[in-house]
Amino acid sequence: MAMKILNQFIDDFVGVFQYRFMDTFQYFKERKKSKYLGDRFEEWVVKNSNISKEGYPDLCDKKIFWRLLDWRGDKYIEGYRPLSSSSPDLLMECVTTTSTIHEVGDIIAVECKWRSKIGFYLDIKDIEKYERYMNRPIKNLFYVFGFGWCGDGPESVYVVPARELYDYDKDTRRITFPIKETEKEKMSRLERFKKKDNRCLLYIK
């Protein structure tokens, strides 16, 4: 009788262990894949956004537009994460005098969003994080959406100013989306932000 109980206990213990192991394995597998796809798109954005290499502007190259000030890394474990994880992915400073809307020294923030299918939805909590970060001396916040993947880059890319996606009241921290806009209507409205030349993503005049 005692042996039967012991065997049952061992079977139950092994069953629970296997379940938790597989559940944990699946979680980290999905997290690793999701992070890989996100990181791959971020790297692609950096390489295609007229940013000077090594962080120094080469003013002899007329295509150089930005200096990369910061590139956030999403590092966290079991609820521990740095405050920097609340900031957008990229922080860039204008280094050209040829812009009509940016001056040398102007800083913009860029959040990269890769998805397998077209969709411009944003998580409310993410918006709140990024907008609180925008209380700093940053001129604009942009969302770079990448959809699909073919070869060494996304199939389509949109560079969308935050205010084209929602309004944000800094005093009340209220987020307002366009009223009664369907996803199809949103896609049609944002079509003008689709990039035709993916080699010069953030060449914003």
Region roles according to the model:
Residues 134-167:
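Nucleic-acid nuclease catalytic cores
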Residues 158-205:
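Intrinsically disordered, low-complexity terminal regions enriched in charged/polar residues
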Residues 2-83:
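Acidic-basic catalytic patches of nuclease active cores, encompassing PD-(D/E)XK
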Residues 49, 90-94, 100-116:
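Conserved catalytic cores of phosphodiester-cleaving nucleases, focusing on short active-site segments
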Residues 86:
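Beta-rich catalytic cores
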Residues 67-73, 111-114, 146-148:
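Short loop/turn segments at strand-loop or loop-helix junctions that form parts
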Residues 57-62, 96-105, 150-154:
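Short, solvent-exposed loop/turn segments that connect beta-strands within catalytic domains
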Residues 115-137:
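Mg2+/Mn2+-dependent nuclease catalytic core
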